[in-house]
Amino acid sequence: MKLTCVIIVVALFLTACHAKDKQEHPAVRGSDDMQDSEDLKLAKKCTVDSDFCDPDNHDCCSGRCIDEGGSGVCAIVPVLN
């Protein structure tokens, strides 16, 4: 029984030492991944031009929603050179 416990402890110790050398900066990489996923969740996407929008509360990329009797369409704004 004692031999089994010693073998298990040695195996765990060797496994932990081997895995410890695999990642140089695990905390830094983990926080960067977390930040990227939070940014994606918090990023607000706008409605593209010519898609339907709500005239009272629109989120058009162009910034303009043309009211067409209750429903609206995001305005297509030409780029002037």
Curated annotation (Swiss-Prot):
Disulfides per UniProt: C46-C61, C53-C65, C60-C74
One Pfam family recorded for the sequence: Conotoxin
InterPro entries: Conotoxin
Assigned GO CC terms: extracellular region
Keywords: Cleavage on pair of basic residues, Disulfide bond, Knottin, Neurotoxin, Secreted, Signal, Toxin
Domain of life from the UniProt record: Eukaryota
Known tissue expression: Expressed by the venom duct.
Signal is among the record's keywords: yes
Compartments reported by the entry: Secreted
Signal peptide: 1-19
GO MF entries: ion channel inhibitor activity; toxin activity
Residue ranges the record assigns to the propeptide: 20-43
Keyword Acetylation: no
Family: Belongs to the conotoxin O1 superfamily.
Swiss-Prot/TrEMBL domain comment: The presence of a 'disulfide through disulfide knot' structurally defines this protein as a knottin.
Protein known as: Conotoxin ArMKLT2-01
Species for this entry: Conus arenatus
